[in-house]
Amino acid sequence: MKANFGKKEGEYSRLVSKSSNKLLNSLWEKKQIPEEGWSEHTLDLFLSWLSSHDTNNRVDMIPVGAGEREGRVLTPLVQRLHSNLTHGIGRSGNLLEIQPKALGSSMLACLSNEFAKHALHLLGLHAVKSCIVVPLCTGMSLSLCMTSWRRRRPKAKYVVWLRIDQKSSLKSIYHAGFEPIIVEPIRDRDSLITDVETVNRIIEQRGEEILCVMTTTSCFAPRSPDNVEAISAICAAHDVPHLVNNAYGLQSEETIRKIAAAHECGRVDAVVQSLDKNFQVPVGGAVIAAFKQNHIQSIAQSYPGRASSVPSRDLVLTLLYQGQSAFLEPFGKQKQMFLKMRRKLISFAENIGECVYEVPENEISSAMTLSTIPPAKQTLFGSILFAKGITGARVVTSSQSKTTIEGCEFINFGSHTTEQHGGYLNIACSVGMTDHELEELFTRLTSSYAKFVRELAKEDERINSSGRRIPINESFDMEND
């Protein structure tokens, strides 16, 4: 039966097509996160629109690929997973360059960079001039920045690295072909803070041998975020690049304020942040931000080859889905959740005879002492928490043993300092944590701790009565309290 479509229906069809095109074209013209989030249907439409710009997906001609890379994908499932965007981003030797036969993929890369900059502006880094989304982890992104500065400082051999007991930032220095000069933090009550005087002295002594200073603004308590304002002033005075490892620091208003202030009072050449930790997307990407346009240009030109567009795609889709208001909401929620977590941790600590470190500048991580658990049993307690489904929490013990990473020896690795301590528990509140998760965390933590200390007491009784030590993990039921 022939469908009876008249003039009215035809006009409606043209209106729908016109509205869709207007929405997509408006996005491309503005290159900003929309006020309101988009539906999944609209996101599918957006991806189809982008992929239709790549030559291998054109409908107005049959492409004939005569090169070594023509967007060919054998498996239909893989092609669908990538939404027919198979060319990647950039051209050989420049991540920002447009690929003529992959216009849609290049548009996606452009949108991701502009969205990242807009997101940082919304969070408070208003002076950021340029961003680039790279398909690299935070450590590799740090390495890319350092590699790009090699020509600017041909005599450089070293990177001044403020100790943070996290392997990837240290490895990034060696991967870029440099060696670290390690600066230990200093104690300020409970906090481990930046040794500014030592950094200044090293730069004065080494001068052109220093490639850059790498500071860290997101870390586990009791380490405090580095004093980026003071370091930026030193770097400006001595004309030394300043690289900020801001892995998950976008979640902290105080960290955002400190980075903005560092730019105002001194020198900040690049700020690196993780996509998955800040934007709730899968692991695999980072945002490199700069306060000068040419700083990003040089970093983009140091990337060898083309790059995967997957992290760019995931970021763009996530920000389109959220819109501006929904994007900011989890960051405001994180601050409330952190304060709530800290109150509950202090209450729990007081009930069991422990205390919580006072690290006022760290708005993401907290640390509680474990003096009521023997040092030899603290690691086991951490394992039990993991077995109970508490992921991300860490038990940090203290010892004189040495850990070697890339030839560097560290005493007490994991503690950010050589100082001895009684052991502590780290927990963090990151973007996306819910009230239910927080309540369940303390329910499991409370019950696990109570049973653990009961088993410790029973073990002591067995030792006293029989002289035979029965390991606590033999008697601790991992499944049932």
Swiss-Prot record:
Its cofactor is pyridoxal 5'-phosphate. The modification N6-(pyridoxal phosphate)lysine is found at K277. Pyridoxal 5'-phosphate binds at R69. The keyword Transferase applies. The record marks E68 as: May act as a substrate filter by repelling compounds with a negatively charged alpha-carboxylate. It comes from the Eukaryota. It is found in: Cytoplasm. One of its GO terms (biological process) is selenocysteine incorporation. Keywords: Cytoplasm, Protein biosynthesis, Pyridoxal phosphate, RNA-binding, Selenium, Transferase, tRNA-binding. It is an enzyme of class 2 (transferase). Converts O-phosphoseryl-tRNA(Sec) to selenocysteinyl-tRNA(Sec) required for selenoprotein biosynthesis. This is O-phosphoseryl-tRNA(Sec) selenium transferase. It comes from Caenorhabditis elegans.
